[in-house]
Amino acid sequence: MSITGFSHKGRGVGVRDHQLILPSVVCSTHVSRKIANEVGAITFAHQNGCGIIGIDVPGVDNFFIDLANHPNVQSVLVVSLGCETIQGPELLPKIIRKLSRLLVIQESGGASGTYESGVRQAKQLRDNFKSEKARLDKLIVGLDLSRDTPNLSALKTGLTAAGFEVVVESEHAVSEHNLSKLMSAKAQVVISFPDENQPPTGFPLIPVINIASTSPLHMALASEFDLAQGSSVDEVIELINKVANGQKTKSEISGIGEIVAPRSVRSV
């Protein structure tokens, strides 16, 4: 099956056409949420601000850059406070500039002024840089292995034979952390095998196909998973193609999932 995605200029071709409202600091997450809700964009809450130190400063900075430059992103509005560790004006030049804008709350009339300007600028970005449909020559499929997956070898072989590039992340037992790393690897679709004691999850920028185990929790939440334990490789590939061509996953429909910025240093 051929895949038709969205051409996002320097970001490449994605399978979703998301606008990202990127709060550069915890203090701007509330305003970012209001703007995103008004214009139908994606945003996220996080706890990163003046308290991040050491290697987490470039680490979180690079994570924000990866988010903003992901192929599933159409355009970006960075919302900064003005006195944080990771400064919005320093972040913006590292993002695809033509499709990005910056608002600084302390320079834009406070929260209310930033909200009004943010809604206006987000709409202008969407209207001025409309995405064009384009054929996707290479689909990067991420595998979140938060639990043991008996048929992993057969799955990887099948996905590769189907023409997909496969990226695997299995460091964490909590899917959210693995999903963040798969995002940085530019995975456009993710297959998630959540831990038996964890519910299905998602990632706002990336469609996540959740495959259940036979644990009591997963059986109780069976309707929230896209596929059951024991689904064949052919069934997985068929669903990947459908999702890449626009069919929404269960997590996309329900709106579940968070963006978690990786942290290494304990800080206040």
Predicted segments, located by residue:
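Metallocofactor- and cofactor-centric catalytic cores in central/energy metabolism, strongly enriched
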Residues: M1-F193, P199-V268
